[in-house]
Design a protein with these regions (language model features):
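Vicinal oxygen chelate
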Residues: 1-11, 21-121, 131-140
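C-terminal catalytic core of tyrosine-transesterase DNA break-rejoin enzymes
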Residues: 124
Length: 140
């Protein structure tokens, strides 16, 4: 049997990952997939959230091998990457994110390549881009 196609999954680190796990569900509409906590419940060792057929992974910042390689936005004074979520209902998604406390960095707008996008920042500084453009399909 052939192996499944490779998947690209974004992995993010948070100072308060247990809180952000719930916040991402509230603000962006992710669904819980998996969460593994430390015995005291203060550290999210590994979390997975699903949206459609896509996933993100997140966890608490720790001083381990991976943690030494990956920084949080607050440690960098910004971020070097941002997840892009291809979806419909951009205006409604923007309002949902705003109500949950996201900082809206770019209000919904139509782009010259046929997408409608907005950009926001979560409470710990990760930048999220939402748009109707789907890279697997030609732009209109």
């Amino acid at each position: 049997m052939p192996s499944p196609e490779p998947m690209i999954i974004v992995s993010l680190r948070y100072a308060d990952a247990p809180r952000m796990y719930d916040w991402l569900i509230e603000a962006f509409g992710f669904e819980k997939h998996a969460a593994y906590y430390s015995e005291d419940g203060k550290t999210l060792l590994h979390g997975e959230l699903r949206m459609g057929s896509s996933f993100i992974m997140l966890g608490s910042s720790e001083n381990n091998e991976f943690g030494k390689l990956v920084s949080r936005p607050a440690e960098l004074g910004g971020t070097t990457a941002s997840p892009y979520i291809a979806t419909d209902d951009i205006d409604a998604r923007c309002e949902r994110a705003r109500k949950a406390g996201a900082e809206i960095c770019m209000e919904p707008r139509d782009q010259p390549y046929g997408s409608r996008d907005f950009i926001c920042m979560d409470p710990e500084g990760h930048v999220w881009c939402f748009g109707t453009y789907r890279p697997a399909q030609p732009a209109t």
